[in-house]
UniProtKB/Swiss-Prot annotation:
PROSITE patterns: PORPHOBILINOGEN_DEAM. GO terms for molecular function: hydroxymethylbilane synthase activity. PANTHER family: PORPHOBILINOGEN DEAMINASE. It comes from Pseudomonas fluorescens (strain ATCC BAA-477 / NRRL B-23932 / Pf-5). This is Porphobilinogen deaminase.
């Protein structure tokens, strides 16, 4: 690879390709003349669509194949949804850029009802996320939560076919793919705390590729990175992945970060929450602090039970 060419490893889903094309456009805008090509591939998480993520188990379901491409020099960077990125990286790889965050909220999507509060008792709601399930059932224990996997188009098609009264998706994905008009309402973070990193795009590359790091620098968004650093530190301290009922969300208040964290039973029976404020420069330490507060309330018992159920399948 020359310094004027970058190969982007990406999943083949419409949203992943949008994110890769976004990074490509930003790179070429920042570096006129730079040649950028996409290397699409299929991840394990894309292949196993007949099971909930929590039952498949393991971390890095959507990134390992892309990381292999980096390690084998088949690509120079990999573009990820930050909520899918594991806390630890293979030796020789690292996260060197986080782009500006899109709307981090969850979106309520229905062809009949305008909001979660309007759903009649016993309505069927589709989601593949234990995090969303735990918060939904705490607020509305009468709802029937039904398994929903697949790409954004597939999920919308299942809703349109009448399989669900409503579905919950990340607002960012709908906005990026031009489906903003399908959002019946955005769910406040007070009612559905997002997943760590939700709405943010991250770029992974080889740690030794200094030229690549320099090319990525104009795409890095420091405010988003500070927020996501706090969220990921919480997740890491709880040993969380993208398929467990952990939520966390950080906002900047000047040079302070306000971080909220949550761990919930998938049944909605118990929802633990904690929050703290601290200096932006200590984002990672703040994540550990909030995670410790959750552990002190018994979060590890909830997470052990979830991992145990995944292991029994």
């Amino acid at each position: 690879m020359s310094s004027r060419e970058i190969r982007i490893a990406t999943r083949k889903s419409a949203l992943a390709l949008w994110q890769a094309e976004y990074v490509k456009a930003r790179l070429q805008e920042a570096h006129p003349g730079l040649v950028v090509t996409l290397v699409p591939m299929v991840s394990r998480g894309d292949k196993l669509l007949d099971s909930p993520l929590s039952k498949i188990g393991g971390k890095g379901l959507f990134v390992k194949e892309l990381e292999t491409a980096l390690l084998e020099n088949q690509a120079d960077i990999a573009v990820h949804s930050m909520k899918d990125v594991p806390m630890d990286f293979p030796e020789g790889l690292g996260l060197f850029c986080i782009c500006e965050r899109e709307d981090p909220r969850d979106a309520f999507v229905s062809n009949t009802y305008a909001s979660l509060d309007e759903l009649p008792e016993g309505s069927v709601v589709g989601t593949s996320s234990l995090r969303r399930q735990a918060q939904l059932l705490t607020r509305r224990p009468d709802l029937q939560i039904r398994f929903l996997r697949g790409n954004v188009n597939t999920r919308l098609a299942k809703l349109d076919a009448g399989e669900y009264d409503a579905i919950i998706l990340a607002a960012a994905g709908l906005i990026r793919l031009g489906f903003e008009d399908r959002i019946s309402s955005s769910i406040s973070v007070d009612d559905s705390l997002p997943a760590g990193g939700q709405g943010a795009v991250g770029i992974e590359c080889r740690s030794a590729d200094i030229e690549i790091h320099a090319l990525l620098a104009p795409l890095h968004h420091a405010d988003t990175a500070s927020r996501v650093t706090a969220e990921r530190a919480l997740n890491k301290h709880l040993n969380g992945g993208c398929q467990v009922p952990i939520a966390c969300y950080a906002v900047l208040e000047g040079e302070q970060i306000w971080l909220r964290g949550l761990v919930g039973e998938p049944s909605g029976g118990l929802l633990l929450s904690a929050e703290a404020r601290g200096p932006r420069a200590s984002a990672a330490e703040l994540g550990v602090q909030v995670a410790d507060a959750l552990l002190a309330q018994g979060a590890d018992d909830i997470l052990r039970a979830v991992y145990g159920e995944a292991g029994e399948e």
